[in-house]
Amino acid sequence: YIRHGLRRSEQPADHERAVKAIRILRSLGVQVTETGTQACASPMSRVMAYSKSKAEALVPILTEEQRVLGEGIRAVVITDYEKTSAVIDEIRHLLDEESGGAIAAFKQLLSDEVTDRLDPVLVTGSTVLVDDDLVEEFLAASRQWLEEHGGDVELTTEEHEGFSLVRGKGSNWSPRLYVRMITELFQQGVTRCLVGTRGLLGEGWDASRINVLLDLTAA
């Protein structure tokens, strides 16, 4: 109707209606072109994809999974990114740079007494964050693993509210090394919940003891 009716109308008011309708449809994720319609990125789709409610839903889900699986739970939370750079001005009042990302999911888990018991660890291509309850055990287990696997790395920590940022000093410290190390600690149960991005914990990554997978990606 927009293409064949309003746009072809001889009435200027119809052309204005077409422009308004196209603008509204685009905000809903539908783009009207010269030949038809197609899906497109939109403010609404971004709000839905990066909604804080997705992270908040982790708590009741993992609470129930932990009740059923007990100490044997091995949960993985996958997000699209560590934090988003896709927040545009018109929705900035609804989303911040952490919305929908791994850091937001990690902090959500730490905020609840039950999910905090899973001792979550966040791992991305640039960052390792560890629940403050787990830091000492994590460092001890990591240093032992590095010693056994020839990793000449010195680990340091930077404390934040509720968690610590773990850094490695040494030429061997890289995502390839620390993802392998953290995966093994996860398998052992040092941590029972990993939070990461699909780029690292997606296709090609394997941990045989996973029994809970929560996919927060937009795909």
How would you name each of these model-derived features?
Residues 195, 200-218:
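A short beta-strand element within the Helicase C-terminal
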Residues 1-193:
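Conserved C-terminal RecA-like helicase domain
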